[in-house]
Structures are given as C-alpha cells and as structure tokens.
Design a protein with these regions (language model features):
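Extreme N-terminal starter segment of soluble prokaryotic enzymes
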Residues: 1-3
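Alpha-helix capping/helix-boundary segments
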Residues: 40, 95, 154-156
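An amphipathic, basic-hydrophobic alpha-helix
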Residues: 61-88, 97-98, 102, 132-136, ...
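Nucleotide-sugar donor phosphate/pyrophosphate-binding loop at the beta->alpha transition
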Residues: 107-117, 123-141, 157
C-alpha cells in the first residue's frame, strides 16, 4: 500500500509512534509518505520506501496566524494525486483528521476511494477536544474518519463517552 502519515514532527509520544509505525510499515514493503511541516525527529535522513513532503504554511500579512490546517489539506491532496496514495493516516483528530477530511472532499471527483484512518493519542481527546472552542470540530473529525484507532482502552472508552460517537468503532489493538 501507499500510505500518507501526518503527525506532529516534534518531540513527543505521538510523533514517535507515528514515525516508528511508518518505518515498520516500510520494512514490510509499504510505501510511506510523511506529510508534515518538518521532518519527524525520529525519521533518519534516508530509508527505503519512505518519503517526506513538507507542508509550506506560508506567511501572509492578512493572516495573523498562518492557516496550517488548510495548507496541510492542500499538501495532502497534492501527495495523494502525485503519488497515488491509498490512504491517509492521521495522528491527532485536530487539525490532522480535519485536514484529511478536507483533502478527501477535494479528491472526491478523481479519487473517491481514498480513506482516512485517525489514531487518537490522548491530548486531542482529553484536553484539546474537550475545550468548547474545539469540541464540535473534534467530534466531526472523529466521525468523518473511515477508521479509528486509540493508543489505549482507556482512551477508546473516553472518546466514546465524551463525544457520544455511537456509530464509531475504535480499535485499540488489545
């Protein structure tokens, strides 16, 4: 398979998990495309079947805060089309799964088969997702994902309870 992985590239658990997963999948013969604003800290300079696509956020005087989520959506769209990806695997519901949903909508006329898998890591559900400013978009992004995984049984239960995602099936590998 050809898989796009989006994660925070900085030091932290979710970036490490996403990068190690990508490396392991590449060793099994899959083609992995990391799509993020910087090379993940755990990703060596070169590995077979692994590619890095930088998201250029750009700086415009109109925007006080650069719209990373929109730039990410466009970059995901480009990489899917240019490299024939089969799925986008997002680590964190917002902004990554949100951006993937936008990219998927943009791809609908030419690539209606693209799928989005979202892995929930914790902070996106227990802190950010419960902030009233982000609650609705977090729930939306979870529900629009084609598949969901969580890093623990606790997080699986917390997501279902907190967001009331009755139609969601969340795999936690246990």
């Amino acid at each position: 398979m050809k898989i796009g992985i989006t994660c925070y590239p900085t030091y932290g658990g979710s970036g490490a998990v996403a990068t190690e997963l990508g490396i392991a999948l590449a060793r099994r013969g899959h083609e992995i495309h990391f799509i993020t604003y910087a090379q993940p800290f755990r990703l060596p300079a070169f590995l077979p079947r692994i590619y890095f696509h930088e998201v250029d956020v750009g700086r415009y005087p109109l925007f006080e805060y650069p719209p990373y989520d929109l730039a990410l959506s466009v970059r995901m769209h480009e990489v899917v089309l240019d490299h024939g990806l089969d799925l986008l695997h997002c680590h964190y519901a917002i902004p990554h799964a949100t951006s993937a949903w936008i990219a998927k909508e943009m791809l609908r006329p030419t690539r209606p088969d693209i799928r989005v898998v979202t892995t929930l890591h914790g902070t996106d559900i227990t802190i950010v997702g419960q902030d009233p400013s982000f609650r609705a978009i977090t729930k939306f992004s979870i529900e629009k994902s084609d598949a969901l995984t969580a890093v623990s049984r606790y997080l699986q239960t917390e997501t279902l309870t907190t967001f009331g995602c009755t139609a969601c099936r969340i795999d936690c590998g246990q």
